[in-house]
Amino acid sequence: MSEKGGKGLKSSLKSKDGGKDGSSTKLKKGRKIHFDQRTPPANYKILNVSSDQQPFQSSAAKCGKSDKPTKSSKNSLHSFELKDLPENAECMMDCEAFQILDGIKGQLVGLSEDPSIKIPVSYDRALAYVESCVHYTNPQSVRKVLEPLKTYGISDGEMCVIANASSESVDEVLAFIPSLKTKKEVINQPLQDALEELSKLKKSE
């Protein structure tokens, strides 16, 4: 449109600073902005959806099956059931377990020649575990120190925890065995004496 015929009509696009016609593709310093007018990637498409839906949807999301477990994954899950120990079961300290497993180690050659005896795969792992956390080399001495605690209501299982934890104070023992907190006034001194004796065993060994 010529200047004469278009005096009454002004461009609806004006810049804020000068009132002159502005362009959406220019900045104040004259730098041009290039708009990418290419179409979106093939695996995404723009949807006219409601506000509670996502504006973009990938081709992978259409199927809606990626978040569901497959049959193979279900089969790989194992269920474990806690069972009570047999009545004749006895708790064992780490040092006692190590003594037994280490004794078997010296007989492995002869045992492997007997077809009726099969050493479980877990043997090596069990031996390595108890060997790494054992604190005493003489289980009989440890039992002798802890046995008197039974008169104060401490069970075999709790005795094993005391030995395995190698605690240095009564408070540490109570942290490992909260059930003993109700007996603290009764067992405090006997337990402290036992811990001191266990400490001597560790130093002497």
From Swiss-Prot:
Residues 48-60 have a biased composition (Polar residues). The keyword Ion transport does not apply. GO terms for cellular component: nucleus; RNA polymerase IV complex; RNA polymerase V complex. It is found in: Nucleus. Expressed in shoot meristematic region and in root tips. Detected in cotyledons, flowers and young leaves. It comes from the Eukaryota. Residues 1-79 are annotated as: Disordered. Signal peptide: none annotated. GO terms for biological process: DNA-templated transcription initiation; regulatory ncRNA-mediated post-transcriptional gene silencing. It holds the Pfam family RNA_pol_Rpb4. GO terms for molecular function: nucleotide binding. InterPro entries: HRDC-like_sf, RNA_pol_Rpb4/RPC9_core, Rpb4-like, Rpb4/RPC9, Rpb4/RPC9_sf. Keywords: Nucleus. Disruption phenotype: No developmental phenotype, but reduced DNA methylation at RdDM target loci. DNA-dependent RNA polymerase catalyzes the transcription of DNA into RNA using the four ribonucleoside triphosphates as substrates. Component of RNA polymerases IV and V which mediate short-interfering RNAs (siRNA) accumulation and subsequent RNA-directed DNA methylation-dependent (RdDM) transcriptional gene silencing (TGS) of endogenous repeated sequences, including transposable elements. Required for the de novo DNA methylation directed by the RdDM pathway. Belongs to the eukaryotic RPB4 RNA polymerase subunit family. Component of the RNA polymerase IV and V complexes. Interacts with NRPD1 and NRPE1. This is DNA-directed RNA polymerases IV and V subunit 4. The lineage of its organism: Eukaryota, Viridiplantae, Streptophyta, Embryophyta, Tracheophyta.
